C-alpha cells in the first residue's frame, strides 16, 4: 500500500511476461507423461514376470525389489503434473494482475492532466477538475496495491504447492535397507571420531565457525572464539592430569632404567682405584704427595761426560700460600714422596764462588722427614767438620732462610719438548714450565751434580 502505483505497474510491465511460465509448465507436463509411461511399462513387466515362467521365490524377490522404484515413478509423475499446473496458475495470476494493474500510460496521463489543471487554475476555476483528477489517481493507487497483493498471494501459494522431487531409490533385494542402516551408523561413528580429532587439533577454527553462524561481526566473532578457547583449555587440562595418573605406572620402568644409567655414568667418571690409596696415605695436608697422585714426573738420567743432560721440562706450578690446598695447579713433583721442597738457598745460585758439596746433596735426597734432616745437620756440627773458605748451606726441609733481595731470580727458559698431558684422561691442564733437571758444576776441589729447583718455589721472604 505504501508503494506508488508507478512502481507496481512498471514491475509488471517490464517483466518477462507469462511466456516463460507457460513453457516451463509444458515441460513439466511432458516430464509427468514420461514418468507415467515408465511406470506403466514397469508395472506391465512385473505382471508378466509373475504370470510367466518366472515364478516362485526369485520372481517374488524381483517384484519386491522393483516395488519402491515403481512407486517412485508413479509419485514423481503426479508431482510433475502438479508442478506444471502450478506454473499455469502462476502465469494466469500474472495475466490477471497485468490486466487489472493501471498501465504506465494511464498514470502518465493522470500526471499530465494534473499539471495542466494546476497551470490554468486562474481564480480557482479548476478546483473541481483538479480534485477529480486527484481522486482518480488515488483510485489507481489503491487498485495497483490490491492487484499486486492478490498476485503475490497467488504466486506464493503456487510456489508452496510445488512438491519436491525425491531421488530415485536403488533397486535392491528385500532386507538391504538394514545393511545400509548399519553402514550408515558405522559411517556416522567414523565421521564423529574424525570431527572430534579435528576439534582437538584445532579447536579455535570450530569455535570461530560456530560463532559466525550467529551473524556477529568479525571482531566480535574472534573475541568470542578466543574466550571459548580459554574456557576449553581450562576445562580440558584436568583430563590431561587424570590421563597422566593412569599412565604413570607404565612410565615407572623407564624412569628406573634412566636412573641406573646415570649411576653407571657417575662410576665411569671416578679416578683409577690405584691412586686412591696413595692419596689417602699421604693425608690432606701433603701438597706434594697429592701432586704424585695426580701426575708422575718421569725420571731423567744424567748424560755421562760432564755435559748437562737434557730433560723434558715440566710445567711450573703457580705459587700458593696454602701448602695443603687440594686444588693446586699441576707442578713438578718432588723426587722423594712425602718430603716438602727445600728452600731456595739449597740449589746453585748466581754469584757464589763454589757449589754445595755432594754430601749436602745426598743428605737432601735421603731425608724423609724434617726431623731426620735436623738430626743430620746436628750430627755434622758435632763431628767438627772444618769450615772452608766459602760458605756452606745445608739443605733443610723446614729451613727458614731469607732470600737475598738483591739477587735476581734465575731466568730459565722452557724447553722445546713438553712433558705431555698430565693426569688421568688428560684432565690436568698444562702450562709453560721452567727448566728442570740435573746440572754438573765444576769447582777447584770436587765436581758435584745437584738438582735444579723450579722457579715457582717461593722463599720465606716472599711468603
Curated annotation (Swiss-Prot):
Pfam families in UniProt: PPE, PPE-PPW
UniProt GO BP: response to host immune response
Chain intervals with Pro residues compositional bias: 306-316
Matching SUPFAM superfamilies: PE/PPE dimer-like
Parts forming coiled coils: none
InterPro entries: PPE-PPW_C, PPE_dom, PPE_sf
Main location: membrane
Transmembrane segments: 3-23, 88-108, 112-132, 216-236, 245-265, 276-296, 323-343, 419-439
Localization annotation: Cell membrane
Membrane topology designation: Multi-pass membrane protein
Keyword annotations from UniProtKB, A to Z: Cell membrane, Membrane, Transmembrane, Transmembrane helix
Region (Disordered), start-end ranges: 303-322
Cellular component aspect of the GO annotation: plasma membrane
Family, as annotated: Belongs to the mycobacterial PPE family.
Protein name: Uncharacterized PPE family protein PPE1
Species name: Mycobacterium tuberculosis (strain CDC 1551 / Oshkosh)
Amino acid at each position: 500500500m505504501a508503494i506508488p502505483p508507478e512502481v507496481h505497474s512498471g514491475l509488471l510491465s517490464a517483466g518477462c511476461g507469462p511466456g516463460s511460465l507457460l513453457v516451463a509448465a509444458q515441460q513439466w507436463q511432458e516430464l509427468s507423461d514420461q514418468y507415467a509411461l515408465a511406470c506403466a511399462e514397469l508395472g506391465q513387466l512385473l505382471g508378466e514376470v509373475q504370470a510367466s515362467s518366472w515364478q516362485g521365490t526369485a520372481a517374488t524377490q524381483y517384484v519386491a525389489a522393483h516395488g519402491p522404484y515403481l512407486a517412485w515413478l508413479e509419485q514423481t509423475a503426479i508431482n510433475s503434473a502438479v508442478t506444471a499446473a502450478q506454473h499455469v496458475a502462476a502465469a494466469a495470476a500474472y495475466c490477471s494482475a497485468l490486466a487489472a494493474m493501471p498501465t504506465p500510460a494511464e498514470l502518465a496521463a493522470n500526471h499530465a492532466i494534473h499539471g495542466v489543471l494546476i497551470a490554468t487554475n486562474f481564480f480557482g476555476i479548476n478546483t473541481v477538475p483538479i480534485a477529480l483528477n486527484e481522486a482518480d489517481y488515488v483510485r489507481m493507487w489503491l487498485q495497483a496495491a490490491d492487484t499486486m497483493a492478490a498476485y503475490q498471494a497467488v504466486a506464493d501459494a503456487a510456489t508452496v504447492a510445488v512438491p519436491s522431487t525425491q531421488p530415485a531409490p536403488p533397486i535392491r533385494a528385500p532386507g538391504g535397507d538394514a545393511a545400509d542402516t548399519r553402514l550408515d551408523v558405522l559411517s556416522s561413528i567414523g565421521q564423529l571420531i574424525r570431527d572430534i580429532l579435528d576439534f582437538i587439533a584445532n579447536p579455535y577454527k570450530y569455535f570461530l565457525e560456530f560463532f559466525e553462524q550467529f551473524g556477529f561481526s568479525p571482531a566480535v566473532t574472534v573475541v568470542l572464539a578466543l574466550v571459548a578457547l580459554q574456557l576449553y583449555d581450562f576445562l580440558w587440562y584436568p583430563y590431561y592430569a587424570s590421563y597422566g595418573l593412569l599412565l604413570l605406572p607404565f612410565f615407572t620402568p623407564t624412569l628406573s632404567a634412566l636412573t641406573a644409567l646415570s649411576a653407571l655414568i657417575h662410576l665411569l667418571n671416578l679416578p683409577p682405584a690405584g691412586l686412591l690409596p696413595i692419596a689417602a696415605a699421604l693425608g690432606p695436608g701433603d701438597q706434594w704427595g697429592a701432586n704424585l697422585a695426580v701426575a708422575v714426573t718421569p725420571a731423567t738420567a744424567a748424560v755421562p761426560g760432564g755435559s748437562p743432560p737434557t730433560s723434558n721440562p715440566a710445567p711450573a706450578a703457580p705459587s700458593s700460600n696454602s701448602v695443603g690446598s687440594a686444588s693446586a695447579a699441576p707442578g713438578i713433583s718432588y723426587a722423594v714422596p712425602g718430603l716438602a721442597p727445600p728452600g731456595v738457598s739449597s740449589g746453585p745460585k748466581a754469584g757464589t764462588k763454589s757449589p754445595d758439596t755432594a754430601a749436602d746433596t745426598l743428605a737432601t735426597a735421603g731425608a724423609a722427614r724434617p726431623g731426620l734432616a735436623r738430626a743430620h745437620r746436628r750430627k755434622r756440627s758435632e763431628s767438627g767438620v772444618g769450615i772452608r773458605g766459602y760458605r756452606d748451606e745445608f739443605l733443610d726441609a723446614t729451613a727458614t732462610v731469607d732470600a737475598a733481595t738483591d739477587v735476581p731470580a734465575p731466568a730459565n727458559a722452557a724447553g722445546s719438548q713438553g712433558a705431555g698431558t698430565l693426569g688421568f684422561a688428560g684432565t690436568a691442564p698444562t702450562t709453560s714450565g721452567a727448566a728442570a733437571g740435573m746440572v754438573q758444576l765444576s769447582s777447584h776441589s770436587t765436581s758435584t751434580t745437584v738438582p735444579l729447583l723450579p722457579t715457582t718455589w717461593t722463599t720465606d721472604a716472599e711468603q
